Amino acid sequence: MITEIGIVAGEIWNFLDTHGTVSLEELARGIERPQEWVLMSLGWLAREGHVLVDCKDDVYTIRLREKQKKQEVGNSTF
């Protein structure tokens, strides 16, 4: 089961990387996996900090978290 969750998480990542911000419904349709697998995998990605989940007017949207850019000052990196 853990392996399958990881596989679906990878599919979610690739879908979001290609499509940007999508609704939960669009995501579930787009990767053509059972809703239970999508939700478990999405939870994993959210817990690991890889995706952001927002809700407005009872519609959930999901997007990849942007990589934080390192700020360089002199010889120090923050």
Regions found by a protein language model. Give the residues of each.
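Short, cationic-aromatic polyanion-contact patches
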Residues: I2-A9, S23, C55-F78
